[in-house]
């Protein structure tokens, strides 16, 4: 296994653990009778909503992480530390997810929980952006397929896409459910608009 393969394998393990931990916060409700169980299941909708959104966030982050590292031929010390920074935030996602699910239906507490959740998402976006900027700074870590100057030119586009995350911190003090929905939409945006890794084959005229 090459250097980048070891980093990616370790990262896959962290992503897998973080995404699995999300379901552990959805508890089996206690209720008397079938009707009571349906009511108890419905009352847990904040946990379901928070689980789905955070699953999308981590899952799509993993897809983009895999997309980027499939073009990385070698790693340096800075890249390893930046990748650890990304993983540190990913591993933290179950915590604000559980907090937001717990307080989503409350008034003032829901705003604080949504703001904390949004701040974690901001940290994740900044960490991944720092990793991408380091990779594209010189391009020497990419394999020969990558058009390094073209990859470097995507940094502004990538940064513009991250501007939505700080806005959700302000939205958190307006509506916690809307904040959660906004993070779901941002995750879907990055799901359909993956991190661009321009290759020489794609740039070559047909």
From Swiss-Prot:
InterPro entries: TMEM175-like. The record marks 21 as: Hydrophobic filter residue 2. It is found in: Membrane. Its main location: membrane. Keywords: Ion channel, Ion transport, Membrane, Potassium, Potassium channel, Potassium transport, Transmembrane, Transmembrane helix, Transport. Residues 26-44, 103-110, 175-176 are extracellular. The six transmembrane regions are tightly packed within each subunit without undergoing domain swapping. Transmembranes TM1-TM3 are positioned on the inner circle of the channel tetramer and participate in inter-subunit interactions that are central to the assembly of the ion conduction pore. The RxxxFSD motif within transmembrane TM1 coordinates a network of specific inter- and intra-subunit interactions with other conserved residues on TM2 and TM3 and plays a key role in the tetrameric assembly of the channel. This is Potassium channel B446_29190. It comes from Streptomyces collinus (strain DSM 40733 / Tue 365).
């Amino acid at each position: 296994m090459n250097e980048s393969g070891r980093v990616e394998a370790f990262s896959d393990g962290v992503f897998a653990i973080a995404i699995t931990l999300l379901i552990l916060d959805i508890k089996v409700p206690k209720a008397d009778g079938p009707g009571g169980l349906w009511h108890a299941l419905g009352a847990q909708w904040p946990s379901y909503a928070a689980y789905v959104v955070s699953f999308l966030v981590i899952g799509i982050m993993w897809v983009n992480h895999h997309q980027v590292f499939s073009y990385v031929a070698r790693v340096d010390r800075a890249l390893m530390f930046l990748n650890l920074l990304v993983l540190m935030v990913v591993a933290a996602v179950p915590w604000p997810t559980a907090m937001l699910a717990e307080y989503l239906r409350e008034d003032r507490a829901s705003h604080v929980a949504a703001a904390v959740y949004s701040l974690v998402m901001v940290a994740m976006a900044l960490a991944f952006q720092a990793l991408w900027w380091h990779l594209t700074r010189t391009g020497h870590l990419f394999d020969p397929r990558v058009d390094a100057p073209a990859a470097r030119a995507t940094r502004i586009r990538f940064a513009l896409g991250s501007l939505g995350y700080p806005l959700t911190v302000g939205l958190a003090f307006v509506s916690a459910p809307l904040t959660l929905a906004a993070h779901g939409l941002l995750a879907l945006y990055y799901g359909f608009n993956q991190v661009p890794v321009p290759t020489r084959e794609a740039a070559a005229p047909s």
